[in-house]
Amino acid sequence: NYGTYVGKMDILSSLSTLSFDKRRSKFFTDELLILLKLIDTNQIDYKTLYGSWAGAFGFFQFMPSTMKNYAIDFDKNSYIDLKNNNDAYASASNYLNQIGWNSANPCFFRISYNNWQVVDLPLVPVIPIVIGLI
């Protein structure tokens, strides 16, 4: 059911509320400010900003900082719309390209469990990725 449900929360309200949470106030405040800047510069349409409770938006659930750094207005309609296939896929492709993903590397591994037992495997990422505020 890809794309049929991308969240129903107003992400402006979500980020505003979460910016007051002491545990991650700086992160969510920064995300809120980035979102407001994207709206102010007419890069995104504020009327379409419904997503997750944490402020993620679109088919690929981009946070505002990810939108700012990687989202593309592929269909050239003057707005980045991550609920539009053209913009969403172009943005996801740009994101993967910019973080160094190589199409020659596998994106998943086939695994199996004997008798449904949890197995502790020493898995390491194929591509080391630094996770943090983008």
Model-derived regions, located:
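Catalytic glycan-binding domains that act on GlcNAc-containing polysaccharides
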Residues: 1-134
